Curated annotation (Swiss-Prot):
CDD domains for the chain: URO-D
Pfam families linked: URO-D
Recorded GO CC terms: cytosol
Protein name: Uroporphyrinogen decarboxylase
Reactions catalysed, as given in the entry: uroporphyrinogen III + 4 H(+) = coproporphyrinogen III + 4 CO2
Species of origin: Nocardioides sp. (strain ATCC BAA-499 / JS614)
Site (Transition state stabilizer): 79
Amino acid sequence: MTPDPRLADSAFLKAARGEPVPHTPVWYMRQAGRSLPEYLAVREGIGMLESCMDPDLVVEITLQPVRRYGVDAAIFFSDIVLPLKAVGVDLDIKPGVGPVVAHPVRTLADVEAIPDLTPEHVPFITEAVRGLVGELGGTPLIGFAGAPFTVASYLVEGGPSKEHARTKAMMFGAPDVWDALLRKIAGISASYLEVQVAAGASAVQLFDSWAGALTPADYRAFVMPHSARVLERAGALGVPRIHFGVGTANLLGLMGEAGADVVGVDWRTPLAHAIALVGDRGVQGNLDPTLVFAPTEVMTARAAEIVEAGRAARGHIFNLGHGVIPSTDPDQLKRLTEFVQTYPR
């Protein structure tokens, strides 16, 4: 669809492309979520996956933080396992646990049984994105997908894991199955991003939540080529690509090399160090999410340090170093947003 002409002035998109910005743009991972009373109200009694498949609800939830905070970008409300559910994988998201897969992937036959994703699998995504773009006007919408390693971990472990033992056992011990699985997921994630961009998303973010469990050598050998496939297909869409993982200080350079325009940085890595690692790419981050619980002057002082450090990057998008914590005070996040957006350039 035809982009809103006001998007040409978006500070978020300018920063993502490495262009001069009127102010440091800001948005937050999980900005639409349990920290907002209006989110809890509309989600009451409705499961996560059911919520993600209801276009009207997705539009409302995605818009809530834009209305409340005035952030510089909206991120599409969904879940990284939704594309798997859409193609027929038997899974659910259990409160307090996370995604649970009924029949974990163990063999090549298990991989081959997973269908490729087509737009016909996710008509509700197209409808929701189109509705959002119409409502957002000059505020860009970020589409997103899960990166192959993180999605593979859920499929192999059968749910969330701290050790990723079965995942790594397959990676090291059954490389043919591993390669087939990550190729399959890369195709699904890339197709999911294509659907969102075709409907009007202005940027994409690839989430690799569990990549920090890998050494640089293992990431390069077993994971990076598959993430690169997703980012390459996203690059062909002509929108900025953000690549984010948690605990990835030793992988930031490689995550950029995989094909990102902007590399997300968690709170444990000094932003100046991250900028040196990613080279001629933008960065996103990276305030510790718990600093929103600190006195306002402490929070804003740390935010100022991050904004100042971000000046050395090709482009800087302010964010937390991970998702908004559910018990966060929305009023404090509003103060943070206004502070960053009005901080002198």
